[in-house]
Curated annotation (Swiss-Prot):
It catalyses: uroporphyrinogen III + 2 S-adenosyl-L-methionine = precorrin-2 + 2 S-adenosyl-L-homocysteine + H(+); precorrin-2 + NAD(+) = sirohydrochlorin + NADH + 2 H(+); siroheme + 2 H(+) = sirohydrochlorin + Fe(2+). The active site is at residues 248, 270. One of its GO terms (molecular function) is uroporphyrin-III C-methyltransferase activity. Then it catalyzes the NAD-dependent ring dehydrogenation of precorrin-2 to yield sirohydrochlorin. Finally, it catalyzes the ferrochelation of sirohydrochlorin to yield siroheme. Pathway: Cofactor biosynthesis; adenosylcobalamin biosynthesis; precorrin-2 from uroporphyrinogen III: step 1/1; Cofactor biosynthesis; adenosylcobalamin biosynthesis; sirohydrochlorin from precorrin-2: step 1/1; Porphyrin-containing compound metabolism; siroheme biosynthesis; precorrin-2 from uroporphyrinogen III: step 1/1; Porphyrin-containing compound metabolism; siroheme biosynthesis; siroheme from sirohydrochlorin: step 1/1. Residues 1-204 are annotated as: Precorrin-2 dehydrogenase /sirohydrochlorin ferrochelatase. Its EC number is 2.1.1.107, 1.3.1.76, 4.99.1.4. Residues 216-457 are annotated as: Uroporphyrinogen-III C-methyltransferase. Coiled coil: none annotated. This is Siroheme synthase. Keywords: Cobalamin biosynthesis, Lyase, Methyltransferase, Multifunctional enzyme, NAD, Oxidoreductase, Phosphoprotein, Porphyrin biosynthesis, S-adenosyl-L-methionine, Transferase. The lineage of its organism: Bacteria, Pseudomonadati, Pseudomonadota, Gammaproteobacteria, Enterobacterales. The modification Phosphoserine is found at residue 128.
Length: 457
């Protein structure tokens, strides 16, 4: 971290801007909004500065830079079009241990100005450390679209309720649960935006009187196939609100880096034929932590209801009366095929797609006759160890030996690797691939050479 982000209290504190042009005006607006007692020193001033001075909002000092103006200052900004003057301002401020921003010269400055999203009292600052202001601006614009304009009113109202919340709810867990309900209450937010005091009071009293659930809850979240960008917004919200996250081997490090920092993490790594923690024990972990009143997120690769054993875990919770919900994820079949340039359906080649487990319960058997039918795509999950059997069975039940196949290893990640061939090579190809991997069988695989976009990036 090259810079420490801080928020300065400048109300009624002396600040200096050196410069009287458009850039200086933009900086002055920010300092005035923050309540600073502002002095502006320049040879000439654009008209806006004169307007502000006539309204008593700031003091103008016309003439060359006078470093004695820094003597009482808390903060300074050099915003002239003369690099020599800006350097003098920076050095004079440095000798007085005053933080100084030098416009367009981050290396000469002791602090930089971020892009700001103002939802006072909520403030969001975005900075690229001075290396790419345009990138910081683009990120700010994206965040602006995500944060409702009335969010500041909600935050300000929350501040008025803090003492009451502290008095009514004894533990930190209870207070956090109250605030989580408070901030996601759309009726309250709309009432505040409409200045409907009666509705605000009614909603507030309802929130305080509504009993907090001490049983805890479990949220089953699909993390997607690997690329953190494929995690859903709702999935992101859940992992950032969790008390504890129970996750498996298929959840990428990039996604785990998005988990709330003070949340507990329990690794229960699983892969075909090997369980770091047996499924029954995982079920009991979820149950035990929820019974402690915690918000538990069970984070699974792909989609939890597609070969993720999510249904089994929820049955345990249902039997115990533990509240639960499910956030779907992009399943591996969809993600891996898209990132490999293989459409799962196509008018000319496949009118249906089948998602098939290659890891069966003891004694299990697939409907090979229907799986070998034409005009469909097969996607085998956990099929590496059974690749030779899949090859032999499909051929035995009539699938053409030259049917295209692809194996996608570490799909959607920067480590993605795809090997492809024909059905008679499937068992051999599987020896070249490591888990996690997906097997795709069908004529659509032949489109990969034309549609493969990801490996070209």
């Amino acid at each position: 971290m090259d810079h420490l982000p801080i928020f300065c209290q400048l109300r009624d504190r002396d600040c200096l801007i050196v410069g009287g042009g458009d850039v200086a005006e933009r900086k002055a607006r920010l300092l005035l909004e923050a309540g600073a007692r502002l002095t502006v020193n320049a040879l000439t001033f654009i008209p806006q500065f004169t307007v502000w001075a006539n309204e008593g909002m700031l003091t103008l000092v016309e003439g060359p830079f006078d470093e004695t103006l820094l003597d009482s200052c808390w903060l300074a900004i050099a915003a002239t079009d003369d690099d020599t003057v800006n350097q003098r301002v920076s050095e004079a401020a440095e000798s007085r241990r005053i933080f100084c921003n030098v416009v367009d010269a981050p290396k000469a400055a002791s602090f930089i100005m971020p892009s700001i999203i103002d939802r006072s009292p909520l403030m969001v600052a975005v900075s690229s450390g001075g290396t790419s202001p345009v990138l910081a601006r683009l990120l700010r614009e994206k965040l602006e679209s995500l944060l409702p304009q009335h969010l500041g009113q909600v935050a300000r109202y929350a501040g008025q309720l803090r003492a009451r919340v502290k008095k009514q709810f004894a533990t930190m867990g209870e207070r956090r649960r109250f605030w989580e309900k408070f901030f996601v209450n759309d009726r309250l937010a709309q009432s505040l935006a409409n200045a409907d005091e009666k509705a605000v009071n009614a909603t507030t009293e309802h929130l305080f009187s509504e009993p907090l659930d001490h049983r805890g809850e479990v949220v089953l979240v699909g993390a997607g196939p690997g690329d953190a960008g494929l995690l859903t917004l709702k999935g992101l919200q859940q992992i950032q609100q969790a008390d504890i996250v129970v996750y498996d081997r298929l959840v990428s490090d990039d996604i785990m880096n998005l988990v709330r920092r003070d949340a507990d993490r329990v690794f229960v790594g699983k892969r075909a034929g090997y369980h770091c923690v047996p499924q029954e024990e995982i079920n009991q972990i979820l149950l035990r932590e929820a019974q402690k009143g915690k918000r538990v997120v069970r984070l699974k690769g792909g989609d939890p209801f597609i070969f993720g054993r999510g249904g089994e875990e929820l049955e345990t919770l249902c039997h115990a009366g533990i509240p639960f919900s499910v956030v779907p994820g992009i399943t591996a079949a969809s993600g891996c095929s898209a990132y490999s340039g293989i459409p799962l359906t196509h008018r000319d080649y496949a009118q249906s797609v089948r998602l098939v487990t290659g890891h069966l319960k003891t004694g299990g058997e697939l409907d090979w006759e229907n799986l070998a039918a034409e005009k469909q795509t097969l996607v085998f999950y956990m099929g590496l160890n059974q690749a030779a059997t899949i090859q032999d069975k499909l051929i035995a039940f009539g699938m053409q030996a030259d049917m295209p196949v692809a194996l996608v290893e570490n799909g959607t990640s920067v480590k993605q690797r795809v090997v492809h061939g024909v059905l008679t090579q499937l068992g051999e190809l599987a020896q070249q691939v490591e888990s996690p991997a997906l097997i795709i069988v069908g004529r659509v695989v032949g489109l990969r050479d034309k549609l493969n976009w990801f490996s070209n990036h």
